[in-house]
């Protein structure tokens, strides 16, 4: 029987059928978007929010794959697709046919296989490639398990390498930037002729990451040769060390595909076995693939777009797909998980979240998930509280459930305030509120790449002095915003004294604004300004770097909670708007010996490719000139996003770049968190519906096109609506209809009156 032809025919039928059903959201997803340039997207097989991201690894890339790299070195079970931190790529499998006798042959990360993108196919939950060895490799996944199907040429020796040494070569530890992904200990056991199990414990972007696996094979293993440190260890069935690999050879019917099902766990090998038993019960690869595809289609169907022929429809659903990879599950079916103290606990929730890239995701990705999947956000709130109980502070940036101190700020605060104001309950809100206050007042959080993290100097000086800490301006601005979010939580819970205190801290951003230059700039501990000053300057993590991954041009507008207060510093609306206009027209040149590589997607000095400015296009609403933002938002949507491998202008960053697109294309964006408010931008689809637990939001944009990007008028549930912002409860408290009339010229009257503007911190009180 020619198994290869049968499997290939089934795969071809799937490929054709999947993309023929163009009305289904999952059929619109183009997962190769962002796999080139700086997108750091990996074409993984994964379930929504799944722990397993099973996919190909190419040479020396941050996330594991780059479209331009010609070699595949294997298929690992863990990735962080979208970058924003370099790690994972654990438990790699690689099919081979020739006899393996040498160190060179047993190390696929030194050999690899060429491939062609013409032989590559991916859809939600499935990846397929024909390697130049003529082996067809197919991958699918459930939440906690991966499934492989390898079809070898007729008559070939069917072998598989398992590599526990392989990891992310660009992963540095949090302690020293010269140390790469290091295996602390790994183990592999040949249990019987159908089973292999083991684990890999490593230091990388986060310390002491535990990955356990339990693998079962459809074909009998007739030999399992173990390898450690340049030598085969013949005659042994288990091996422990830091350079462990195995070469498996299969018996059974010649030419028959080898199907592998693999459970993954952060807890134990038995946890991996239980995950496998719960999620994959047979050997039907196509059934698992179909089920995961169905799960993705159901998840993506939360948003339905009526525009049948819109080219942006594929970008939208791909972006929503990327956004719904996170927060990443990190608990077993038993509820057990490994926390930041490396101990195992059991939680009362379905999902313990193991990847929290909060510096990125607090802006739009987490608020988007709170709208579409409040159940996931509820478990995320429980995750935050569990993390606090085990390590004494709320997460800053976690990977594999472990804190790594990456980036700045304490951005659990916006997540909590956003979830609570949206009515998401089912967790101990008062305990979480106490955790917010404790976390925001720690003198020392820890260190990242030898750089200090903490609020000691911030509290002492009411700004972070540039002679005492790097990225001092960015830290100050983000601490102020996070403190504002704490104040919102205090207001909602009725804590007046706390509200007054944190509102006061939220105004400390004013201490770094130079009114002579109209820029935020670094200030020394003696109160003097850092000199010389260059608003185009970036010197990534060097001693004179006052701005995290950006310039003063980009960071001066990071006061999302107090637009009016910021305008007052500029001297009023007109100079503020003039400066904001200039942001998009000045030179895109970046000065400095080591400019931050993340400053990408530039329009003037506006950088769409990095997160600090994602709200900036909406700051025109504070000034009563929303039409200026409408045009620029439309330009970004149409020029900086497409479905090509280069279609994301920066790292997707745990889905934040994608979530910005999703929210913005709906016509509104969460500039602030904790007030339940969205700033109106510009919609791009004629009609879409958003399904949420309380009903359906219908969004219509009559006459919309790229040219017709200007709002002429708005109605909410049939009534005229002139405000340039919206309340969450009006959109998502039940069924609602938001309708736009669009045109080619701006209506400068709509959304421009003082009563139509969003509230700023300087005008808010405890009561309102």
Question: What is each stretch, according to the model?
Answer:
Residues 21-366, 370-414, 420-477, 485-511, ...:
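Accessory carbohydrate-recognition regions in carbohydrate-active enzymes
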Residues 482:
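ATP-dependent phospho-/nucleotidyl transfer catalytic cores
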Residues 690-692:
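Extracellular/periplasmic, surface-exposed regions of secreted and cell-surface proteins
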């Amino acid at each position: 029987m020619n198994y290869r032809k049968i499997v290939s025919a089934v795969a071809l039928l799937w490929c054709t059928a999947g993309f023929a059903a163009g009305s289904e959201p999952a059929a619109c997803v183009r997962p190769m978007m962002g796999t080139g340039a700086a997108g750091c997207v990996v074409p993984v097989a994964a379930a929504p929010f799944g722990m397993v991201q099973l996919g190909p690894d190419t040479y020396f890339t941050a996330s594991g794959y780059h479209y331009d790299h010609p070699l595949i070195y294997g298929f690992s079970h863990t990735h962080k697709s979208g970058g924003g931190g370099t790690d994972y790529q654990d438990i790699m499998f690689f099919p081979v046919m020739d006899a393996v006798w040498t160190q060179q042959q047993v190390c696929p990360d030194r050999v690899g296989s060429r491939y062609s993108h013409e032989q590559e196919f991916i859809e939600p939950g499935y990846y397929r490639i024909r390697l130049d060895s003529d082996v067809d490799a197919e991958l699918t996944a459930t939440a906690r398990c991966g499934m492989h199907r390898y079809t070898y040429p007729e008559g070939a020796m069917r072998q598989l390498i398992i590599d526990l040494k392989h990891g992310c070569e660009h992963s540095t530890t949090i302690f020293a930037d010269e140390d790469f992904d290091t295996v602390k200990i790994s183990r592999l056991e040949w249990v019987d002729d159908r089973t292999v199990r083991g684990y890999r414990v490593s230091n990388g972007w986060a310390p002491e990451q535990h990955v356990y696996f339990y693998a079962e094979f459809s074909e009998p293993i007739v030999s399992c040769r173990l390898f450690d440190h340049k030598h085969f260890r013949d005659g042994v069935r288990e091996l422990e060390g830091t350079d462990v690999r195995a070469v498996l050879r299969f018996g059974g019917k010649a030419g028959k595909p080898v199907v592998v099902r693999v459970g993954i766990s952060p807890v134990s090998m038995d946890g991996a076995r239980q995950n496998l038993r719960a999620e994959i019960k047979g050997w039907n690869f196509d059934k698992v693939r179909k089920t995961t595809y169905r799960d993705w289609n159901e998840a993506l169907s939360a948003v339905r777009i009526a525009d049948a022929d819109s080219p942006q429809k594929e970008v939208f659903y791909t972006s929503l797909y990327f956004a719904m990879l996170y927060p990443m599950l990190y608990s077993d079916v038993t509820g057990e998980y490994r926390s930041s103290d490396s101990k195992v606990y059991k939680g009362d929730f379905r999902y313990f979240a193991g990847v929290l890239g909060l510096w990125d995701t607090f802006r739009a990705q987490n608020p988007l998930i709170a709208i579409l999947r409040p159940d996931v956000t509820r478990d995320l709130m429980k995750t935050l509280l569990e993390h606090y109980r085990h390590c004494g502070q709320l997460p800053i940036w976690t990977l594999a459930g472990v804190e790594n101190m990456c980036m700045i700020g304490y951005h659990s605060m916006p997540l909590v305030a956003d979830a609570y104001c949206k009515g998401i309950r089912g967790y101990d809100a008062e305990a979480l509120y106490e955790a917010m206050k404790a976390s925001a007042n720690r003198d020392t959080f820890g260190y990242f790449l030898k750089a200090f993290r903490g609020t000691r100097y911030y509290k002492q000086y009411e700004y972070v002095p540039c002679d005492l800490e790097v990225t001092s301006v960015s830290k100050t601005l983000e601490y102020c915003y996070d403190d504002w979010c704490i104040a919102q939580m205090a207001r909602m819970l009725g804590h007046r004294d706390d509200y007054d205190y944190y509102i006061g801290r939220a105004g400390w951003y004013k201490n770094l604004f130079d009114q002579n230059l109209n820029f935020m700039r670094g200030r020394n501990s003696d109160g003097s300004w850092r000199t010389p000053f260059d608003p185009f300057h970036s010197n990534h993590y060097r001693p004179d770097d006052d701005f995290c991954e950006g310039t003063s041009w980009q960071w001066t507008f990071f006061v999302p909670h107090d637009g009016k207060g910021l305008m007052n510093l500029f001297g009023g609306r007109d100079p503020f708007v003039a400066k904001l206009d200039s942001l998009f027209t000045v030179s895109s040149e970046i000065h400095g010996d080591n400019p931050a590589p993340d400053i990408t997607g530039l329009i003037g000095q506006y950088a769409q490719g990095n997160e600090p400015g994602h709200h900036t296009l909406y700051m025109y609403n504070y000034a009563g000139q929303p039409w200026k933002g409408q045009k620029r938002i439309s330009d970004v949507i149409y020029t900086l996003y497409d479905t090509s491998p280069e279609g994301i202008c920066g790292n997707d960053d745990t889905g934040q770049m994608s979530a910005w697109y999703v929210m913005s294309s709906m016509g509104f964006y969460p500039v602030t968190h904790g007030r339940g408010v969205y700033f109106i931008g510009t919609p791009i689809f004629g009609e879409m519906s958003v399904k949420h637990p309380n009903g359906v939001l219908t969004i219509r944009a009559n006459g919309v096109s790229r040219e017709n990007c200007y709002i002429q008028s708005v109605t909410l549930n049939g009534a005229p609506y002139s405000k340039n912002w919206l309340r969450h409860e009006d959109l998502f408290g039940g069924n609602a209809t938001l309708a736009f009339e669009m045109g080619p010229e701006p209506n400068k009257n709509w959304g421009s009156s003082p009563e139509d503007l969003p509230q700023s911190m300087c005008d808010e009180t405890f009561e309102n």
